[in-house]
């Protein structure tokens, strides 16, 4: 067995597809009309009720029990892109987690919660450029020095 994708219910496949392509640069690898699969493993499905065999009114909107998470190396640049998009409904502004990663959460066109955070490598590099040692970064982020070194070598 292998994991193949996560499927999101969408009301308009064309608008949803454009949203994910334009905002995140996702690439479609399969297009079946009412169903689109991106190369990252995210899929969009119009007429979700038909697909899984339930009444349309049982398809939930904004359940707040799952989020689609992305990491962005140019977080500030992405924020500028977001602020220029009138279709974006924000859950909140930018927050900084205890481990130092800045994130923002907002909704897609169908109410799915999305988180975009600074790439962890960038967080570590920001701390180091501000004069922190790896040991201090390790303590601040509650991550071992070995794991920090792995993250610093990680290339997307």
Segments predicted by a language model, with ranges:
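Short glycine-enriched loop/turn motifs at secondary-structure junctions
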Residues: 1-2, 59-65, 98
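Short secondary-structure junctions
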Residues: 25-30, 89-93
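Conserved short beta-strand elements that form part of the metal-binding/catalytic scaffold
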Residues: 27-62, 113-118
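N-terminal beta-strand motif that seeds the catalytic metal site of vicinal oxygen chelate
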Residues: 1-14, 66-68, 119-156
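Helical anchoring/docking segments at protein termini
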Residues: 2-4, 9, 31, 37, ...
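Amphipathic alpha-helical segments
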Residues: 12-26, 84
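Vicinal oxygen chelate
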Residues: 11-13, 68-113, 129-130, 140-150
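Short hydrophobic/aromatic beta-strand or adjacent loop that forms the aromatic wall/cage
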Residues: 33-35, 65-67, 101
